[in-house]
């Protein structure tokens, strides 16, 4: 399966095989980040991202096919992320996949980008359904029950900022380079997490939702109180911010796991995916939560947590095995819920992230 990913600021292509025993093998996984193109602006510029996908995608597909050592005739299908994401990039990837499918008479699979993250652990580990997924990225923060391919139940979501978005915005406040998430993590290692008493959002609530905008505002206010922000101030602010995120996340996940057990029984695992899952401090916190819940933690390698083509190819293989094939009328989507039955969390007006 050829997989194509173009939903944000990574252009990626990969070839993944599925053996007769169901195990996956990554034959190639080529990713070209657009960090340099967007660094000047301190964030992703959709028009620049779309043009970069146009410029790079054909070359990356050629490289992925060469590295895999196969011809197009060897493919059982081509999968592309059809959303959710920046619509210009999504159109580039899906249109390219349709062309390949038409020319080489191979099945097309239009993959939900979030589903690809949700299924990635089955590419790297032997894991059965149902499992509990913590998906945290620049655009999404969700706790999801993964009951099967195409069968997802959202247990919790952010009601404002996504976790990766909050990390990036705090980095920007502090003048740290883009992308900000890794910069905050690195600075936090040198800081005093007890110096600033930031709020722990949503702590103790009976639902499993997240909220990060208030914490982000608290960081901004604290920065404003410091006359001259030093390197140590930056490190302490990052450490204190990250500590608040970790405590809040652990609490939200404990509630999410309880909700999972009430509906599905004990999960086969707690699984983490998305770019934020590459943060080592968050990984350690998730491990503690899993141990307390009496389940195992499964986290794909960092390179498979961030956006990549292998996860799209694997999701395509999972869907193809169940006969889930799409036609040429498959539409690109800027928004695409993973859980089709999800509703907006009650009592919150700002629900842009994840909806």
Swiss-Prot record:
Binding-site residues, substrate: 135-139, 168, 181, 279
Keyword field contains Transferase: yes
Subcellular location field: Cytoplasm
Record text on cofactor binding: Binds 1 Fe(2+) ion per subunit.
Keyword S-adenosyl-L-methionine appears in the UniProt entry: no
Keywords of this entry: Acyltransferase, Cytoplasm, Iron, Metal-binding, Transferase, tRNA processing
SUPFAM superfamilies noted in UniProt: Actin-like ATPase domain
Record GO biological process: tRNA threonylcarbamoyladenosine modification
GO-annotated molecular function: iron ion binding; N(6)-L-threonylcarbamoyladenine synthase activity
CC cofactor: Fe(2+)
Residues annotated to bind Fe cation: 113, 117, 307
Biological role: Required for the formation of a threonylcarbamoyl group on adenosine at position 37 (t(6)A37) in tRNAs that read codons beginning with adenine. Is involved in the transfer of the threonylcarbamoyl moiety of threonylcarbamoyl-AMP (TC-AMP) to the N6 group of A37, together with TsaE and TsaB. TsaD likely plays a direct catalytic role in this reaction.
Xref: NCBIfam families: gcp_kae1, T6A_TsaD_YgjD
Official protein name in the record: tRNA N6-adenosine threonylcarbamoyltransferase
Native organism: Bradyrhizobium sp. (strain BTAi1 / ATCC BAA-1182)
């Amino acid at each position: 399966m050829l997989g194509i990913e173009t939903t944000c600021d990574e252009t990626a292509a990969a070839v993944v095989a599925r053996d007769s025993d169901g195990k996956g093998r990554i034959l190639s996984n080529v990713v070209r980040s657009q960090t340099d193109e967007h660094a000047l602006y301190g964030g992703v510029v959709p028009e620049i991202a779309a043009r970069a996908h146009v410029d790079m995608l054909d070359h990356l597909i050629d490289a992925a096919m060469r590295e895999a050592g196969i011809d197009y005739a060897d493919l059982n299908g081509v999968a592309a992320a059809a959303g959710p994401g920046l619509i210009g990039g999504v159109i580039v990837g899906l249109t390219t996949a349709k062309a390949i499918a038409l020319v080489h008479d191979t099945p097309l699979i239009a993959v939900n980008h979030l589903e690809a993250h949700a299924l990635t652990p089955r590419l790297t580990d032997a894991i059965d359904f149902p499992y509990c997924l913590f998906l945290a990225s620049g655009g999404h923060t969700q706790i999801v029950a993964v009951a099967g391919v195409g069968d997802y139940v959202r247990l919790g979501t952010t009601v404002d900022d996504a976790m990766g978005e909050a990390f990036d915005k705090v980095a920007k406040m502090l003048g740290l380079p883009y992308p900000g998430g890794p910069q905050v993590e690195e600075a936090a290692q040198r800081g005093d997490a007890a110096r600033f008493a930031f709020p722990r959002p949503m702590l103790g609530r009976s639902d499993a939702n997240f909220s990060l905008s208030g914490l982000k505002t608290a960081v901004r206010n604290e920065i404003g109180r410091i006359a001259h922000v030093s390197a140590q101030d930056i490190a302490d602010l990052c450490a204190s911010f990250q500590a608040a995120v970790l405590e809040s996340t652990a609490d939200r996940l404990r509630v999410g796991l309880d909700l999972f057990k009430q509906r599905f029984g004990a999960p086969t695992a707690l699984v983490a995916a998305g770019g934020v899952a590459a943060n080592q401090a968050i990984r350690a916190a998730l491990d503690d939560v899993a141990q307390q819940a009496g389940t195992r933690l499964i986290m794909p390698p960092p390179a498979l947590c961030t956006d990549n083509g292998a996860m799209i190819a694997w999701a395509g293989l999972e869907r193809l095995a169940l006969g889930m094939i799409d036609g040429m009328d498959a539409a690109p989507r800027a928004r695409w819920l993973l859980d089709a039955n999800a509703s907006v969390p009650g009592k919150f007006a700002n629900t842009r992230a994840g909806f």
